[in-house]
Amino acid sequence: MEVYLMVRIMLVGCNGKMGRIITHCSKDFNDIEIVAGVDKSSTSNLDFPVFENIHSSSVECDVVLDFSRPSSLKSLISYCTEKKLPLVLCTTGYSKEELNLIEETSKNIPIFKSANMSIGINVINSLLKDISKKLYKDFDIEIIEKHHNQKVDSPSGTALLLADTIKDNVPEKLEYIYGRSGHSKRTKNEIGIHAIRGGSIVGDHDVIFAGIGECIEIKHTAISREVFAIGALKASAFMKGKPSGMYNMDCMLNS
């Protein structure tokens, strides 16, 4: 049996904007190789074979990395379950049913899921676990996210990730308010989440703790999409050989 030191990745969504960036960034990793791609159009000038359907692939790999759309989920899960392969999900906008399917499938194969593959965002997310406990009583919490005008889901998966982290780490029940309109007064136990779409903004997230006489802002700005590509490639390398279960950026950063 051959032992491969390289991490061989099958990239789903390889012809998309992020897929192209991941392919470019992979050349800077000595231990990673993209050996095949999957995309709705198999026409490309990439250095590896591209298949329109993942089940058509005859190329062996160690990890399947998905940067496509939620509609691809069922075929990816079917393929990875059959091949016993780790699945790295970088797509956002999943329905509750799809999230339940991911959770259930992780009992049989290793699945890595993160709403944002940036290491910086995930460090901030980790900090929020402690900060929220100390500030929630005396500070109003608002989250503002900004993205390019081509992003279809809102609020962003990252904004929800940050909000969920705050909500899960305070004893009181917090409600999400998406945008604000009308004349109702802000209640105490809520997190305001606001989405802005315009131009070519890569990704901007601002968590605001507004108190009496002071305001704390924790902000992350993605300057280039390469930050997401690098995180996705590192996550793929991390997942090689992992046992079944759910994994996220915290697992990787703390390993």
UniProtKB/Swiss-Prot annotation:
- Top-rank EC class of the record's enzyme: oxidoreductase
Taxonomic classification = Bacteria, Bacillati, Bacillota, Clostridia, Eubacteriales
Per UniProt, (S)-2,3,4,5-tetrahydrodipicolinate binds at: 148, 157-158
Q: What does this protein do?
A: Catalyzes the conversion of 4-hydroxy-tetrahydrodipicolinate (HTPA) to tetrahydrodipicolinate.
Q: In which pathway does it act?
A: Amino-acid biosynthesis; L-lysine biosynthesis via DAP pathway; (S)-tetrahydrodipicolinate from L-aspartate: step 4/4
Superkingdom of this entry's organism?
Answer: Bacteria
Per the record, the gene is dapB
Record: active site: 147, 151
Q: Give an example GO biological process.
A: diaminopimelate biosynthetic process
Name its cellular compartments: Cytoplasm
**Binding-site positions, NAD(+):** 13-18, 90-92, 114-117
- Any idea of its EC number? 1.17.1.8
Disulphide-bridged cysteine pairs: none
Query: Which PROSITE patterns has this protein been placed in?
Result: DAPB (PS01298)
Q: Mind telling me what this protein is named?
A: 4-hydroxy-tetrahydrodipicolinate reductase
Family membership, please give it. Answer: Belongs to the DapB family.
Q: Which InterPro entries match?
A: DapB_C, DapB_N, DapB_N_CS, DHDPR_bac, NAD(P)-bd_dom_sf
Q: Which CDD domains match?
A: DHDPR_N
The alphabetical list of record keywords is: Amino-acid biosynthesis, Cytoplasm, Diaminopimelate biosynthesis, Lysine biosynthesis, NAD, NADP, Oxidoreductase
Q: Name one Pfam family in it.
A: DapB_C
Predominant place of localization: cytoplasm
Matching entries from NCBIfam families are given as: dapB
Q: Name one GO cellular component term.
A: cytosol
A GO molecular function annotation here is: oxidoreductase activity, acting on CH or CH2 groups, NAD or NADP as acceptor
